[in-house]
A protein has these predicted regions:
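Transmembrane-helix motifs of polytopic, lipid-linked glycan transferases
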Residues: 116-133
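Start-transfer (signal-anchor) and selected internal transmembrane alpha helices
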Residues: 1-45
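Transmembrane-helix signature of polytopic, membrane-embedded enzymes
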Residues: 32, 129-148
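Short hydrophobic/aromatic helix or loop-helix immediately within or flanking a transmembrane segment
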Residues: 61, 65-72, 76-108
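Membrane-embedded helix bundles of polyisoprenyl
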Residues: 139-158, 162-169, 173
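Conserved small/polar residues in nucleotide/adenosyl-binding loops
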Residues: 181-187
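Membrane-interface transmembrane helices that cradle and orient dolichyl/undecaprenyl
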Residues: 133, 168-180
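Extracytoplasmic loop-helix module adjacent to an early transmembrane segment
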Residues: 35-36, 40, 49-77
Length: 191
């Protein structure tokens, strides 16, 4: 609870600092100030989500156990799981286990995986907020709504769903750009 308030206060203070600079810089620097605020907010959310203890959230510990189990799976087991899920209709989350296995090629540290998931979730969110707002205050209000409507809790407890949400933010951007070839990648991965 206190961490959410700290994030909101830090972002508010940074926004006020940027507004003071904006008055001195002029209109050209305003877009850069918006981008800086969006990046700052995104980094805070990544840190909040990625550096949490495994005891935070009811599912984080179970996700950690699942992560360690699936890092030990062979690629053949991952392939068989895909076939079981998508052809036989048995099991679930084949895309998530594939993501875990791919990630385990680089690191088997669960905390690093949580930071990676934070990046996958919050970079698209930050980009979405930046592209769909016009003022510094809009970015802060978006962060305020995110924190107060318990979506920050969702990103801590539902890792698979949070990853899917990150892909949805990317998909919205692709739809707006009418780039359907990029849209098929996130929707077919079924994370």
């Amino acid at each position: 609870m206190y961490l959410k308030v700290i994030i909101l206060v830090l972002t508010l203070l940074y926004m006020l600092f940027l507004k003071l600079q904006y008055k001195q810089i002029g209109t050209i620097g305003y877009d850069k100030a918006r981008k800086n605020l969006a990046i700052f907010s995104t980094l805070l959310l990544i840190l909040q989500s990625g550096l949490r203890h495994v005891g935070v959230g009811p599912d984080t510990y179970q996700y950690m156990l699942s992560f360690h189990e699936h890092t030990l799976w062979t690629w053949q087991q991952i392939l068989h799981n895909f076939i079981d899920v998508y052809q036989a209709g048995e099991g679930k989350d084949a895309g998530y286990y594939l993501l875990v296995k791919l990630f385990s090629e680089f690191s088997t540290d669960y905390q690093v995986f949580l930071v990676f998931v934070g990046i996958v979730v919050f970079v698209p969110l930050g980009r979405f907020v930046y592209k769909n707002t016009e003022r510094l205050e809009d970015i802060w209000v978006a962060l305020l709504l995110y924190q107060t409507l318990f979506y920050s809790f969702f990103s801590v407890t539902g890792i698979r769903q949070a990853i899917a949400t990150g892909f949805c933010f990317l998909s919205v951007e692709c739809i707006k750009a009418v780039s359907y070839t990029h849209l098929t990648l996130p929707t077919t991965s079924r994370v």
